[in-house]
């Protein structure tokens, strides 16, 4: 998947993505797994890629996202990724097996590099 992104694949993420990414970095720093300077380099390098943040999904938080989170017993964060892929007809990439199963049940195609 990383190679596809490097090669210029379109990447679309829900609005929560930036906060999830920052949280991951902050937790890793707190646990001394990564230095703040490394986080800064990572974020700078990430800017080189075209990543579209879909703000429209926020409009569906109280309906589709909530329904999918309940139905598939996922977090609202996970359900926001499902909602985005379903609404925009995008393939779905994850290593989370239960999330992948939920995507399959929704008829969302898996990402094929």
Regions found by a protein language model. Give the residues of each.
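Short, well-structured N-terminal submotif of metal-dependent ribonuclease cores
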Residues: 1-17, 28, 32-41
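Short beta-strand scaffold positions
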Residues: 13, 76, 93-94
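Acidic catalytic patch
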Residues: 15-18, 38-71
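Alpha-helix capping/helix-boundary segments
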Residues: 17, 60, 81, 98-99
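Short amphipathic alpha-helical interaction patches enriched in hydrophobic/aromatic residues
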Residues: 25, 29, 50-51, 69, ...
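Acidic, PIN/NYN-like endoribonuclease modules and their adjacent C-terminal/linker elements
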Residues: 82-113
């Amino acid at each position: 998947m990383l190679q596809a992104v490097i090669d210029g694949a379109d990447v679309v993420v829900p609005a929560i993505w930036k906060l999830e990414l920052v949280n991951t970095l902050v937790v890793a720093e707190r646990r001394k797994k990564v230095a703040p300077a490394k986080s800064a380099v990572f974020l700078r390098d990430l800017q080189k890629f075209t990543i579209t943040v879909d703000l429209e999904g926020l409009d569906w938080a109280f309906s589709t996202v909530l329904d999918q989170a309940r139905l598939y017993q996922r977090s609202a964060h996970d359900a926001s990724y499902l909602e985005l892929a379903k609404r925009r007809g995008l393939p779905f990439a994850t290593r989370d097996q239960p999330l992948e199963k939920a995507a399959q049940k929704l008829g969302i195609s898996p990402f094929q590099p």
